[in-house]
Amino acid sequence: MIEADRLIQPQVLAQDEHIDRAMRPKLLDDYTGQDDTRAQLKIFIQAAINRKEALDHMLIFGPPGLGKTTLAMIVANEMGVNIKSTSGPVLEKAGDLAALLTNLDEGDVLFIDEIHRLSPVVEEILYPAMEDYQLDIMIGEGPAARSIKLDLPPFTLIGATTRAGALTSPLRARFGIPLRLEFYNVKDLCTIVTRSAKVMELAIDAGGAHEIAKRSRGTPRIANRLLRRVRDYAEVKFAGEVTEDVAQQALDMLDVDQEGFDYLDRKLLLSIIDKFMGGPVGLDNLAAAIGEDRETIEDVLEPFLIQQGFIQRTPRGRIVTPRAYQHFNIITPDVPK
């Protein structure tokens, strides 16, 4: 399991929730980045409003911390409807889902985070609800049991997942709008950091925002978390304003390097370099070497390292790239031809 105190982990921390809520944009025009996704959503939402219909069911997928929950709330705001939120692991029984569905009004949004973790029993109930706006309920037990159908008002299901491949094919096929969120570029993260600083009434210059943005691993949630810790440093050590120099000092103290890596990223890369001669190394061996589970490596650590060109997945296992050697000032070994 990934350690709970990891500053740059993209999963939401309990202490972040109320602060993140205050920083979330409410409308698409205030939403920064994901330009293609934003443009598509504007069209889909306006078309649904013009037809006075519920928006088609939507699946939002991508690495954690990129704004899937925020986007679901924006959709509800833009459509002018209510949103009810839950998560896959919470819906243990069919009755849990039925209770949510029967309390929806016409056009409402039902948001299910971690939808890939729905139990098969709950998923079966979801199929007719999504397709026909009907709920099949079993009344009674044994020979006296009978099925009744309840009509549901048209609604929009928004599912969010970090593992789209883990969804069953029948469930995935029922989403009319699939949206993939990508890591953010530094320019967009600068805009997000500046906006968040304004919400926090924190003075920050362009250099300070850029320094935080480039170490945020392409993830707004991490950018906002780093901003709060840099603010603490600035208030204690300086007059409170976040400049480039202040941000550099704070982030160096927090052990977040220029690439946005912390000790766990460096541990993974150095394990492949030192213990496995640069790779290839299998996922199970790598997980044992760094003391983490497969899911943490695949879902949390690897996506950013692969996207930034520090690791490659090959049929034989993971290998580090020359860029990883350069990051640690290690001479790249000669590869036998």
From Swiss-Prot:
Region named Head domain (RuvB-H):
258-337
GO BP, one annotated term? DNA recombination
Q: Where is this region: Small ATPAse domain (RuvB-S)?
A: 185-255
List of residues binding Mg(2+): 69
**Where does the chain bind DNA?**
294, 313, 318
Matches recorded under InterPro entries: AAA+_ATPase, AAA_lid_4, DNA_helicase_Holl-junc_RuvB, P-loop_NTPase, RuvB-like_N, RuvB_C, WH-like_DNA-bd_sf, WH_DNA-bd_sf
Q: Where in the cell is it found?
A: Cytoplasm
Any GO molecular function: ATP hydrolysis activity
Where are the stretches annotated Large ATPase domain (RuvB-L)?
4-184
* GO cellular component terms, A-Z: cytoplasm; Holliday junction resolvase complex
Where ATP binds, per the record, is at 24, 65, 68-70, 131-133, 174, 184, 221
- Supply the CDD domains for this chain: AAA (cd00009)
A Pfam family that this protein carries is RuvB_N
Alphabetically ordered keywords of this record = ATP-binding, Cytoplasm, DNA damage, DNA recombination, DNA repair, DNA-binding, Hydrolase, Nucleotide-binding
Coarsely, its chief localization is: cytoplasm
Q: What is its EC number?
A: 3.6.4.-
Which reaction does this chain catalyze? ATP + H2O = ADP + phosphate + H(+)
Do you know which NCBIfam families this protein is assigned to? Answer: PRK00080.1, ruvB
Question: What does this gene product do?
Answer: The RuvA-RuvB-RuvC complex processes Holliday junction (HJ) DNA during genetic recombination and DNA repair, while the RuvA-RuvB complex plays an important role in the rescue of blocked DNA replication forks via replication fork reversal (RFR). RuvA specifically binds to HJ cruciform DNA, conferring on it an open structure. The RuvB hexamer acts as an ATP-dependent pump, pulling dsDNA into and through the RuvAB complex. RuvB forms 2 homohexamers on either side of HJ DNA bound by 1 or 2 RuvA tetramers; 4 subunits per hexamer contact DNA at a time.
Q: Which family does it belong to?
A: Belongs to the RuvB family.
Q: What domain comment accompanies this record?
A: Has 3 domains, the large (RuvB-L) and small ATPase (RuvB-S) domains and the C-terminal head (RuvB-H) domain. The head domain binds DNA, while the ATPase domains jointly bind ATP, ADP or are empty depending on the state of the subunit in the translocation cycle. During a single DNA translocation step the structure of each domain remains the same, but their relative positions change.
The annotated subunit structure for this chain is: Homohexamer. Forms an RuvA(8)-RuvB(12)-Holliday junction (HJ) complex. HJ DNA is sandwiched between 2 RuvA tetramers; dsDNA enters through RuvA and exits via RuvB. An RuvB hexamer assembles on each DNA strand where it exits the tetramer. Each RuvB hexamer is contacted by two RuvA subunits (via domain III) on 2 adjacent RuvB subunits; this complex drives branch migration. In the full resolvosome a probable DNA-RuvA(4)-RuvB(12)-RuvC(2) complex forms which resolves the HJ.
Q: Which PANTHER family match?
A: HOLLIDAY JUNCTION BRANCH MIGRATION COMPLEX SUBUNIT RUVB, PTHR42848
Q: What name has this protein been given in UniProt?
A: Holliday junction branch migration complex subunit RuvB
Q: Which organism is it from?
A: Shewanella denitrificans (strain OS217 / ATCC BAA-1090 / DSM 15013)
